Amino acid sequence: MSDALKPLIGAAADRPLTRAEAEAAFEILFEGEATPSQMGGLLMALRTRGETVAEYAAAAAVMRAKCNAVRAPEGAMDIVGTGGDGKGTLNISTATAFVVAGAGVPVAKHGNRNLSSKSGAADALAQMGIEVMVGPAVVERALSEIGIAFMMAPMHHPAIRHVMPTRAELGTRTMFNILGPLTNPAGVKRQLTGAFSRDLIRPMAETLAALGSDVAWLVHGSDGTDELTITGVSWVAGLSDGAVTEFEVHPEEAGLPVHPFEAILGGTPEENGAAFRALLAGEASAYRDAVLLNAAAALKVAGRVTALPDGVMLAAEAIDSGAALAKVQGLAQITSEAT
C-alpha cells in the first residue's frame, strides 16, 4: 500500500491534478504499489470529476515509459479505435490498416481483443491466419519487411496487469478505456483514431498534442461508431501544427455513397473473416466503401494525399491490385514463423 497515493486521491476528488501529480499517481499504480481500493478510488475520483487533458497525458506518458517499445519505420502511423461503441460493426480499422499499408504507408497498429464488435481487431486477424501474441522482435521484423504489424496491448504494456482486476471489478468505464490509442508502443507521430463518444475527440486530440504527436484525426460517427462512418456525417478533431480544429466529414465529399447502418453490421468471427476476405478480393459493398473512406482519411493524415477523393482512389488501387491482400499474407507468414 502506498501512503503517497492517499493525498493524491483526495486532491483528485476536489480539483484537477497537475500533470506532475497525475504522473506520480500513475507511477504508483503501474508499479503495483497501490491497493485495489486505492486504484478504484483514484479512477472513480477522476471519472466523477471529469478527467482533464493533463491527467490523460500523464497516464499515457507513464504507460509509454513502461512499455515494451518497438522501432518503426519513418512515417509509420496507427489506425485504431477505442472500441466500446457497442455497435457490433464489421472490423473497419483493421481492414483499413492493411489497405493503407498496401498503399505504401507503414502501419504500426495497436489493439486488443474485442470490446463491442463480435470480432475485434485481434479476432479478425486470427481469422486471416495472423498470430497476434507476438513480441517486439517479431513486430519490428514485420514493420521492416512488409510495412505493417499488429501490437497486442498486453504484450507491450505489462504494467497494466496491476490495474486490470480493479477495472474489471469496477464494471464501468474509466480513463483506461481511451488510453490504448494514446499509448502506441512504436511511438508513432501520426494516427487516425476513433472514439466511442463525440465528447472525447477534442480532449484526445489535445492529449496527443501534449504527448508530441504531429498529425492526428480523432473521429466519431453520427451513428455512434468509433470511426468515420459511411452512414452519414462524422465529427473530427484534427491535430496539425500543434493546433486542434473541429470539422465534419461526409461520405459524399470523398465521392462515396451513403449506406444504411445495417449494411456494415458484423456477425460471428467466421462471418466477419469471410467479409474481410471478400473485401480484399475486390468485392463491392458498403464494407468496402467504409474502408475506403477511412483509408482515405488515414492517407491524408499520413501526408500522402491532400484531398479525400484522391485518398479513395489510392486506397481502391491498393485493394484491386492485390497489394492489401499481400500485406495480410506477409504478416500471416512472419507471425506463423515466429510461433
Swiss-Prot record:
Gene behind this protein: trpD
NCBIfam families from the UniProt entry: trpD (TIGR01245)
InterPro entries documented for this protein: Anthranilate_Pribosyl_Tfrase, Glycosyl_Trfase_fam3, Glycosyl_Trfase_fam3_N_dom, Glycosyl_Trfase_fam3_N_dom_sf, Nuc_phospho_transferase
Record: residues binding 5-phospho-alpha-D-ribose 1-diphosphate: 81, 84-85, 89, 91-94, 109-117, 121
This protein's name: Anthranilate phosphoribosyltransferase
GO terms for biological process, alphabetical: L-tryptophan biosynthetic process
Binding positions for anthranilate 1 per the UniProt entry: 81, 112
Annotated metabolic or biological route of this protein: Amino-acid biosynthesis; L-tryptophan biosynthesis; L-tryptophan from chorismate: step 2/5
SUPFAM superfamilies per UniProt: Nucleoside phosphorylase/phosphoribosyltransferase catalytic domain, Nucleoside phosphorylase/phosphoribosyltransferase N-terminal domain
Cofactor(s) named in the record: Mg(2+)
Keyword Glycosyltransferase in annotation: yes
Pfam families from the UniProt entry: Glycos_trans_3N, Glycos_transf_3
Keyword annotations of the record: Amino-acid biosynthesis, Aromatic amino acid biosynthesis, Glycosyltransferase, Magnesium, Metal-binding, Transferase, Tryptophan biosynthesis
Residues noted as binding Mg(2+) 2 in the record, renumbered to the chain: 226-227
Known catalytic reactions: N-(5-phospho-beta-D-ribosyl)anthranilate + diphosphate = 5-phospho-alpha-D-ribose 1-diphosphate + anthranilate
Record-listed E.C. numbers: 2.4.2.18
Sequence positions that bind anthranilate 2: 167
UniProt cofactor note: Binds 2 magnesium ions per monomer.
Function: Catalyzes the transfer of the phosphoribosyl group of 5-phosphorylribose-1-pyrophosphate (PRPP) to anthranilate to yield N-(5'-phosphoribosyl)-anthranilate (PRA).
Self-association state and partner proteins as the record states: Homodimer.
